[in-house]
Regions:
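Conserved amphipathic alpha-helix within the SDR
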Residues: 1-11
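Substrate-binding pocket helix/loop in short-chain dehydrogenase/reductase
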Residues: 27-28, 35-40
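SDR active-site lid
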Residues: 104-174
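Active-site helix of classical SDR
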Residues: 51, 87
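Active-site-adjacent segment of SDR/Rossmann-fold oxidoreductases
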Residues: 76, 97-108
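Active-site loop-to-helix junction immediately N-terminal to the catalytic Tyr of the SDR YXXXK motif
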Residues: 31, 77-85, 97
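Residue(s) in the substrate-gating loop at a strand-loop-helix junction
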Residues: 71
Length: 217
């Protein structure tokens, strides 16, 4: 196993980044169970496997830091990427709960919650082997919702600073931190923003338009 091999080679394991993640999205009514299962298998189980490999080693040596990559979508609701958002919320919960257990053993745990980062995930869409559903143009949608994507190099600098400071939740860039704080302070404002973005996306991408239902007797 990679973790054990690194520990044998170097005699210590100081820092582990669990960075598994794929984008899975679309209107929930269009998704199949396979969409949900794939998101869970990669985005959540991938992190669980990383923790299961690294945590025992760090317990034995009495130090180390595990950084689990979630997303700002793990702190704030994210319509039309609901499976992704769900799994990233789970990664935050895993990280903060484990952090409470690990502290007494000298092991640190952080949840990394970046905003939109300029990587290939913005252009990939759903995995090609899953049933085809209408989904978003990731790059266009997130730019509208969250502003221009953040460079991976700038994120790396912010992450290492957060690790050095032992932050429980590392949120970057600044606009992502502001969005999170707004959600904590005034969640109804974020909800209204989400509703507007959902209406725009339904029209823009043809995502399961709302059909009026006749409820008259």
């Amino acid at each position: 196993m990679l973790v054990e091999e690194a520990h044998r080679r170097d005699g210590r394991l100081d820092l582990v980044f669990n960075n598994a993640g794929i984008g899975v999205g679309g209107a929930v009514e269009d998704l199949t169970l396979s969409h949900w299962e794939r998101a869970i298998d990669v985005n959540l189980r991938g992190v669980v496997h990383g923790v299961a490999a690294a945590y025992p080693v760090m317990l034995r040596q009495g130090h180390g830091h595990i950084v689990n990559t979630a997303s700002v979508a793990g702190l704030i609701p994210a319509p039309f990427i609901t499976p992704y958002s769900m799994t990233k919320h789970a990664v935050v919960g895993l990280s903060l709960s484990l952090r409470g257990e690990a502290a007494a053993h000298g092991v640190r745990v952080s949840a990394l919650c970046p905003g939109t980062v300029d990587t290939a995930i913005l252009d990939r869409g759903n995995p090609e082997d899953l049933p085809d559903v209408r989904t978003l143009d990731g790059r266009e949608y997130v730019t509208r919702v969250a502003g221009a994507p953040y460079s991976a190099d700038a994120l790396a600098t912010d992450v290492l600073r957060g690790v050095q400071l032992n932050r429980a939740v590392i949120v970057a860039p600044r606009r992502a931190r502001m969005a999170w704080r707004l959600h904590l302070a005034a969640p109804w404002i974020v909800e209204q923003m989400n509703l507007r973005n959902v209406a725009w996306a339904r029209e823009r991408y043809g995502l399961s338009p709302v059909v009026a239902v006749d409820t008259s007797p």
